Amino acid sequence: RGSTDRSVEICKTFAPNWEIRNSKSLEFDAYLVDQEVMEIEREITGWKMVLNTTEFLCCYNKEQFFKSLNTMSGNMFSIRMIMMIDEPTHGYTNPRYSSPLVKQRYHGIIIQPNPNQLYLNGRLIHNNSHGNYRVGRHGSHYPYSIYMEPAFIFKFFYSPWNDAMKKRKLQIGPTLSQHSVRRGLGSHHITTIEKLEKKYKYYATLTTDLRLFPEYQIIFPDLCP
């Protein structure tokens, strides 16, 4: 769909066995993209999860993770999200392709569920024919439970905070469909570099060292002091 963040090139290089499909939608329309995603899900059996380019599912043991899904009651689970945000005084350097990005950054905010509210911050994994998603795919019209074992979606939100990430955030807004703009879907993508820097400074005051959290230590024991 005309992406300029090299995501297709990156997939071909690091995941050559992946199937790459061109989107049917020439513009970025959250509703239409979700419908297209669900059409593709109908072609697949077993556990399914839809992630954006900047999102990574991390757990300590993949086999144990899927075994737990099969033994738990339910067909759909929300995996909690960690918003990755660089701590400005930590001295992070630009990422290296020789090491997984999730092992090069360890500051962020764990979005924990509120028992009195529907959790609409994670990503859903399910074995239904499709996800029946709410717009944006953080929630579903199907019932789902929150997966509370040590597994997270690492969303690189304001991390790595370098020129490449800033350009990626700025490229999305101009591709929004008028339908999305009118409905306020994805309006946060319509921004400027000044607004991005202001938001980063705010989120940087909230970011924490994830290595201090027991659940993170289980997933990445080699990164923890």
Residue ranges and their predicted role:
Residues 30-35, 59-225:
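Catalytic-site signature of metal-activated, phosphate-bearing donor transferases
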Residues 1-10, 24-26:
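A conserved acidic beta->alpha catalytic loop
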Residues 12-31:
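Conserved donor nucleotide-binding strand/loop of the catalytic core
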Residues 18, 47-49, 74-76:
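Short, Asp-centered acidic motifs that coordinate Mg2+ and/or phosphate
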Residues 45-59:
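Short beta-strand-to-loop acidic/aromatic patch adjacent to the donor-nucleotide binding site
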Residues 34-48:
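Active-site nucleotide-sugar/metal-binding loop of Leloir-type enzymes
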Residues 13-15, 43, 71-72, 148:
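Short, well-ordered coil/turn elements that cap or connect secondary structure elements
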